[in-house]
Amino acid sequence: MRVTLLIGGYVFDRVAQEGTELITEYVRTILEANKKGHEFAIVAGGGKLARDYIGIARSLGASKSVLDDIGILCTRLNAYLMISALGDKAYPHPPSNYRDYLSAFLSGKIVVCGGMSPGQSTDAVAALISEYLHSDLMIKMTSAEGVYDRHPKETGAKLIPKITYSHARKIISEYSYDPGTYELIDPIALKILERSNIPCRIVHGKDPKNILKAIEGRNIGTLVYGESR
């Protein structure tokens, strides 16, 4: 199976706070799956690092385009952490555009990137890479157990185990979430996945073994899928 793995900023926040054990466990899990024949394309989110730097730059009067550039640079720093952890299994640099990503992927190494274009989330980057590579599955490792019918901190919030693209769009339109807290999935990424009918499994990033469970099709997190599947 070819998998696009989006490692959300939450994971790198944990690494910054707690040390390298979590990212090391991610590498073990990815390489274990790789030995079983699964291919990985990896995208790193920005997390608190990006939010902090964007906040400082905003207070200094930086333009939105500069804020976008700062966010991209922070995701690339996190990508370098993942590359360092993967060692010689990884392509040595995070590609900065899709053409370079595809060329790097053909090297047979595990390619890790951050953001690509201003105004585009790493969700959208992962979705486009999934489309370019004809990935069988996109997995998003995030700070929640999956998609809920409302904010997960609200009383009575229920995890949705399976949801169609259209239902996901409805939830996005009905609920608003503060940036950097609970993140469902970027609507642009959702549209990209829908047009290519690529399923996305959204799971909690606290346990790297969730990657294997998602690949195996186990009932974990939330599966976002097309009506034709």
How would you describe each model-predicted region?
Residues M1-R229:
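C-terminal catalytic "cap/lid" subdomain
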